[in-house]
Amino acid sequence: MARAIMFQGTGSDVGKSVLVAGLCRVARNRGLKVRPFKPQNMSNNAAVSDDGGEIGRAQWLQALACGVPSSVHMNPVLLKPQTDMGSQLIVQGQVRGEARGRYYQELKPQLMAAVMESFAKVGDGADLVLVEGAGSPAEINLRAGDIANMGFATHADVPVVLVGDIDRGGVIASLVGTHTILPQEDRAMVRGFLINKFRGDISLFDDGLAAITRFTGWRSFGVVPWLKAVSRLPAEDSVVLERAVRGDKKALIVAVPMLPRIANFDDLDPLKAEPAVEVVMVPPGSSLPADAGLVVLPGTKSTIADLLALRENGWDRELVAHVKRGGHVLGICGGFQMLGRRISDPAGIEGNVRDIEGLGLLDIETMMEPEKVVRNVEAVSLLHDEPLEGYEIHIGRTSGPDMARPFARIGDHDDGAVSPDGRIMGTYLHGVFSADRFRHHFLRALGVEGGQMNYRESVEEALDELAEGLEASLDIDGLFALA
C-alpha cells in the first residue's frame, strides 16, 4: 500500500480540495509519483474521467496537478443531489441508483469494499497518495459506517491533518471543538493541523497557533495566506458562486441564473478569465441584468425541477424580454433542454412531473430516457468551424426542426441546435469555452474582442503559483514525513 496522508476539514468549504490540488503539484515538483483520492464526494460538479466514468471535478483538477490521467478510482463514491431528500449514487464511475437519507447510511458499510479497492488501485505504483475528506469528522452522528472521513482513515490506517478556515471566523473554536468531540480512536489519527485562508500579517496569529496546540496537543504545520492563484482555479462548490459580486462594467455582461441544482458551473470559468467579460451569477429573487448581452442557462442535475424554479423566479419572462432586446442565449446540457418546446419524462426519471412545457425559444423537444451518456468528446463547432474538446453527462434525447442547425459536430453525429436568427443556441457539450479559438470567435460574434489567453495554460500556471505559496507557508517536509 502506498504512503498516504488525509486532509479533513473542520467543516465544508474550508478549502480542502484546492489545498490538496496544490500539495499534489508540490509533490510532483519534488519528483514524487503522487495521486489524489477522495473516498466520497457530494457534488453536481462532475467530470468524465480519462477512463470514462464520473468523478468530482475536484479530483479531475487534482489529477491534473499530479500530471496523471484521471480515474474513476480517485473518487469511488460520488453523490449527485437531485432532490431535497435524495441523490444519484455513482460508484466507481457508474450509476448505481438513488441514495436517500437513512437508506444511504445503511448502505455505506457495503461501499467500504469499493472504496478500499479503489484506494489500492490509486496507490499502485505511487510514492504518495493525498486523500481528501468530505464535510467534517465532527459530524459524529454520521460516524457509524462512515467512509468519507475517520471511518476511512481508521480502516486504511492513514494519518490525518485537520484544516481550519480562518476567513470565516472561529477557527480556534472549530479545531479545539473538533478535538473535544472526536472519539479517542479518531482523535489518535490526527497528527496536526493547518490554518487556511489567512489575510494580513500571519505573525498576529502566533498566539492562536499556540493556543490550539495547548488545548489539543496537535502540532501546527503552518498558516496558508489568502492566495490569489486560488481564484483562477475551478471551484467545486456552488457556495463560491453565491459570493460573487459585480465589479466594474465590462464590454460584455454574461448573466447566469443560479438554479437550485446547478451543475458543472466551471463551464463558465474561461469566460470569467476574459478581461472584457463579466459573468454575473443571478441569485433567486433577483432579476437578470437588463444590460446582459448573453444569458447562459447552465447544466443542472434536475432539469424539470430547475425549469419550475426558473419560472417561479420570473426568469422565463425576463429571458423573453432579453431576446426581444436583441440578446443572445446559450443553454448547456439541462439548460439546452429547457430552451425547447417541451420536456417529457414518462418514466418519472426526474420525479413526479411527467410532462412540462419548455421555454419555447428553440423548436425542439426532449424525451427523458434511463440511459445516461457519459463521455469525453472531440468535436467541431459548426458556428465557427473551430475544434472543441468537451464532455457529455446527461440523460434525455432531443429532437426537432432546429436540430437541423446544429451547434457542433461530434464524430458522425450532430449536437445541439441553433435558432434561425442564430441568437439562441443549445448544446449538450460541457467545457466548450475552454477551447481558446472557439471562445475568441464566439465572443467576437457578440461584439467583444476576446483576449489571447490560453485557458489551460492559465490553470497550469495557477497550480504552480499555488504550489509555490504552499511551499513558502507550510512545513512540507513535516507533512510528507507523516506518510
Swiss-Prot record:
This is Cobyric acid synthase. InterPro entries: Class_I_gatase-like, CobQ/CobB/MinD/ParA_Nub-bd_dom, CobQ_GATase1, CobQ_N, CobQ_synth, GATase_3, P-loop_NTPase. Keywords: Cobalamin biosynthesis, Glutamine amidotransferase. PANTHER family: COBYRIC ACID SYNTHASE (PTHR21343:SF1), DETHIOBIOTIN SYNTHETASE (PTHR21343). Catalyzes amidations at positions B, D, E, and G on adenosylcobyrinic A,C-diamide. NH(2) groups are provided by glutamine, and one molecule of ATP is hydrogenolyzed for each amidation. It comes from Brucella suis biovar 1 (strain 1330). Residues 251-438 form the GATase cobBQ-type domain. GO terms for biological process: cobalamin biosynthetic process. Belongs to the CobB/CobQ family. CobQ subfamily. SUPFAM superfamilies: Class I glutamine amidotransferase-like, P-loop containing nucleoside triphosphate hydrolases. NCBIfam families: cobQ (TIGR00313), PRK00784.1 (NF001989). GO terms for molecular function: ABC-type vitamin B12 transporter activity; catalytic activity. Pfam families: CbiA, GATase_3. The active site is at C333, H430. Pathway: Cofactor biosynthesis; adenosylcobalamin biosynthesis.
